[in-house]
UniProtKB/Swiss-Prot annotation:
Tissue-specific expression: Expressed in the left, stem and flower, at very low levels in roots and is not detectable in mesophyll protoplasts.
Top-level taxon in the UniProt lineage: Eukaryota
GO MF annotation list: metal ion binding
Function: Metallothioneins have a high content of cysteine residues that bind various heavy metals.
Keyword vocabulary terms for this entry: Metal-binding, Metal-thiolate cluster
Name of this chain's protein: Metallothionein-like protein type 2
Species for this entry: Vicia faba
Family classification: Belongs to the metallothionein superfamily. Type 15 family.
Record PANTHER family: METALLOTHIONEIN-LIKE PROTEIN 2A, METALLOTHIONEIN-LIKE PROTEIN 2B
Ribonucleoprotein keyword on record: no
């Protein structure tokens, strides 16, 4: 597992991100939380619930950071 000196890791599309990542780790994920208030009136109609979630992309099968915080080809399987 390589961390490029602790300064960056590989993020999406085998580009370097800002966290310390490595093989099988995705450093570019961010988590946000929001609070909302809702009023639900029962018995008027049907409601479709939609949930937002953070996406975890694994399309590049993990990356390794190379020299000077550049990513080597995505060779981690």
């Amino acid at each position: 597992m390589s961390c490029c000196g602790g300064n960056c890791g590989c993020g999406s599309s085998c580009k370097c991100g800002s966290g310390c990542g490595g093989c099988k780790m995705y450093a570019d994920l961010s988590y946000t939380e929001s609070t909302t208030s809702e009023t639900l009136i029962m018995g008027v109609g049907s409601e479709k619930a939609q949930y937002e979630s953070a996406e975890m992309g694994a399309e590049n099968d993990g990356c390794k950071c190379g020299a000077n915080c550049t990513c080597n080809p995505c060779t981690c399987k």
